[in-house]
Amino acid sequence: LSKIYKVANGTADLYVYFYELALNMLKPNGLKGFICSNKFFRAKYGENLREYILQNTTILQIADFNGVKIFEDATVDSAITIFQKQKADNNSTFKVVDVDLINSYLMKQSDLTKTSFSFSNPKELAIKQKIEQIGTPLKEWDININSGIKTGFNEAFIIDEATKNELIKKDPKSAEIIKPLLKGRDIKKYDCIFKELYSIATFPVLKLEINNYTAIKEYLQSFGKRLEQTGEKGSRKKTTNKWFETQDNIAYYKDFEQEKIIFSKASKDTVFYYDKQHFYIDVTAYIISGNNLKYIISILNSLFFKTQFYKFYSGGGIDGEMTIFTLKEFPIPKIDEESQKPFINLVDEILEAKQKIKDYKPLLDEAIKNNNFDREIALKKELENLENICTTNEKIIDQMVYKLYDLTPDEIKIVENSFRN
């Protein structure tokens, strides 16, 4: 396809090629409309198509249903795109139709870039311009963002508490390569729900000798041909890895053993967890490792990030798909260590409160079970106080983030109204 189409990309959905094909079939000044996925507006694979449209067409109208499920059976968000086979001039404008299909506004085609198609009225566009003038894209920070573990066969490599205990009982050495695991759906705002799942961490990069782990070897052998990495029917994808190893190399495995940020690939909310417990993650989540993480997570968990990321930087998808590519594009203001301290202190208080909430809830259950009413009342009051600390600190951070991006009172209203809507 790359030899035939200028919009080609190895990971692109097939509909991308129909845009170029349709344009080639049109007569000069001809019109064409599409109703299809909106993912190419912001996804990395759509960069060639975005550039192609900007260079070869005049956009007439776009309706972007980002975050709105128009077609019940569709697995991604949709869009209506109408363009003309004619190169746009510098002053060319097009109509952006709101999701209600009633309200609309004009936007200059020159305000779109091949990096991303983001549709905004002038006031919203002014906020985006502030974000990009004041902030530095995360890809330029001293951090790494990596995906979770792709095993190729989770039924074998992800185990429960009972299986973990049995393997360690048979061979204590098993504990060396059994790691606590979180999935994307376990991630909450500044928190997580550990469901007592574990990963057998036989990563190819470790070059393990499986005979040194007798219980795990015996356990994995019980899955037979399904663990083979030959690409044959009934086995895993073909790789050069050994039968007992995970599908992906996981060269960054040491990052799991550090403090880090964890977030879900697909979530209806933007929630980030600060991990100090050395959790490993499966392929449904990502990790951020590196420097300035507590300051960064304060921005990522803010209301401002939630609204602006999905409006301008996300890759579409009805479940709020978040990718490494799109997150790396989001600009965060770089400030010195002293200026970061107020953000970090508030995050530390939230993390401490979240941990106490976890510690107190079993005590409350015990008090209720034992009909210890005084204890029950005291614990409920303490839990309420801890929840209030989290809520209050999050609201304070929101206001600090507005100030960080130099938002006016009117711009703050736009941000908060977009969240309510």
Where are these regions (language model features)?
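Short, flexible loop/turn elements at secondary-structure junctions
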Residues: 36-40, 66, 85-87, 186, ...
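A short, contiguous, amphipathic alpha-helix enriched in charged residues
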Residues: 51-59, 224-227, 304, 308
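Non-catalytic DNA-recognition/assembly elements of restriction-modification systems
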Residues: 132-142, 153, 215, 222, ...
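Conserved hydrophobic/aromatic beta-strand scaffold that supports enzyme active sites
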Residues: 78-82, 181, 262, 287, ...
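Signature of N6-adenine DNA methyltransferases within the class I
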Residues: 1-172, 207, 273-285, 293, ...
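Short, ligand-facing micro-motifs at secondary-structure edges
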Residues: 64, 262-280, 298, 306-317
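Proline-centric
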Residues: 22-27, 188-193, 198-208, 285-294, ...
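Polyanion-binding catalytic cores of nucleic-acid enzymes and NTP/SAM-utilizing transferases
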Residues: 122-286
